[in-house]
Amino acid sequence: MNKEIVSKPVQDLGIAAYVLMHQYQLAGRKEKTFIFKVAKEKLKEFEDLKTAYLFSEFHDFDHCLMGLKKLEEYPFTIESNKFVTDLGAAAFLLMHKFKLLGKKGRSFYFDIHTPDEESQFDEMNLQYASSPFHDFDSKLMSLKKIL
């Protein structure tokens, strides 16, 4: 059986990464638009995914990423020894309600006071690497590199 395939454009990078996470095939890119191959019987599901992304945790994660990218170097001393250098991990920690103190160089410093908070911070930092948010971040980065 030969399925009819339709080309569907997606202009938002976050939506494109989210759609890619749901196994839709990327056909190419034209300027800032990503083109996906979608079986005709999957068109409604595809469109529903685009809407779902805007109200998902992945959109929140992307919002945290964008905020962190805009963050300028903090000009004062930061009294914290808990930091991460991975932008995605920092966004993941922000989503889990850890308070960001500032950025120094490539490091994002967090406000941690108790051994329990430190343990939770370390656990969340490790969880990020195997989370769907890491996969989403990886897809964002890959899509940016497609010319």
Regions found by a protein language model. Name each.
Residues 25, 53, 97-99, 125:
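Short, flexible coil/linker elements and helix-boundary hinge sites characteristic
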Residues 1-2, 76:
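Glycine- and charge-rich intrinsically disordered segments
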Residues 27-31, 96-106:
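Major-groove DNA-recognition helix of helix-turn-helix-type DNA-binding domains
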Residues 5-22, 81-96:
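Polyanion-binding surface elements
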Residues 35-79, 106-147:
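Long, continuous compositionally biased terminal/linker segments
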